[in-house]
Amino acid sequence: DLYSYRYDLTDYSAYRTNTIGGGVRLGFPLTLNARASARYTLRRDEVEIPASFCDPNAAVVSISLCQQRGAYTTSLVGYGVRLDRRNDPINPTRGFYTALNQDLAGVGGDVNYLKTEVEGGIYYGFSPSFILSATGSAGYVDGWNGDTVRINERFYKGGNSFRGFETAGIGARDLNSARGDALGGKAYAIGSVELTVPTFLPEQYGVKAALFSDFGTLGMLDDEDKLTVAGAVDPNIVDDLSLRASAGVSIFWRSPMGPIRFDFSQVLAKEDYDKTETFRFSTSTRF
């Protein structure tokens, strides 16, 4: 694979990333329901933050964020293992799945880290109209050989991954800026419980509904990323692993353009600096 893209997070933080790179992947079955994969990636990332944001005379973001600017090369190897015993990968009504992925950066290049993510879910259908599911995911990334975790290698959660919160709406935040720039986190754990319920609409309308509750946490920066230029702890960088939670209703519509999802959410637990939302519209793979 060869690719080039720009990841623009300036609506939620102070930076954007330009990336060019490539990689090779190999996947193979272990059993009827289990697969494994291996990969190698080589890429060049350039983190851009406007110079005016980092002017010492009028800085609007923290020094630790400004220090993330620059270009660097990442060379990593990784693998994944997945067991899937659901009766349908798109709209399951029974069964379970679990997956593990790890990436080791530092096989050459400029950065060194180990990133691990796990996920899983279980599904049980009481009837065609009532289907209960419980899913969860967790991740941790940490530098090695003296490296900290750069801002674009951290985890960001919210939006589709945590309903009730904006994209990058939870996690560590830099309050030096009026907006409160998202800084992500080295660790996260998120769970979701969902119950599909009948809508009592004719099937040809293509509408389904579900009640849900999402809950979890995200945070944990390196200590070096919480300091001022003088080396003191910056009180305007907030970072904790407190519980966040939300509940609401999702509507799935099989539209002529493809599956669409509408989420109506109410936040039940949050920090004052989190960014929340009550409605989200998105495309969906599920129906």
Language-model segments: which ranges?
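Gram-negative/organellar outer-membrane beta-barrel architecture
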Residues: 1-88, 92-97, 163-164, 170-175, ...
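Short loop/turn motifs that connect adjacent beta-strands in outer-membrane beta-barrel proteins
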Residues: 31-36, 87-96, 109-111, 126-132, ...
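Transmembrane beta-barrel strands of outer-membrane/channel proteins
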Residues: 2-6, 38-44, 96-104, 118, ...
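Extracytoplasmic gating/loop element in the C-terminal half of outer-membrane beta-barrel translocons
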Residues: 129-225
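Hydrophobic core residues within well-ordered beta-strands of beta-rich domains
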Residues: 20, 75-77, 96, 116, ...
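Residues on the lipid-exposed face of transmembrane beta-strands in outer-membrane beta-barrel proteins
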Residues: 22-28, 77-83, 118-122, 136-138, ...
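Outer-membrane beta-barrel transmembrane domain signature
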Residues: 131, 216-247
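Transmembrane beta-barrel strand/turn architecture of Gram-negative outer membrane proteins
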Residues: 18-30, 98-106, 112-144
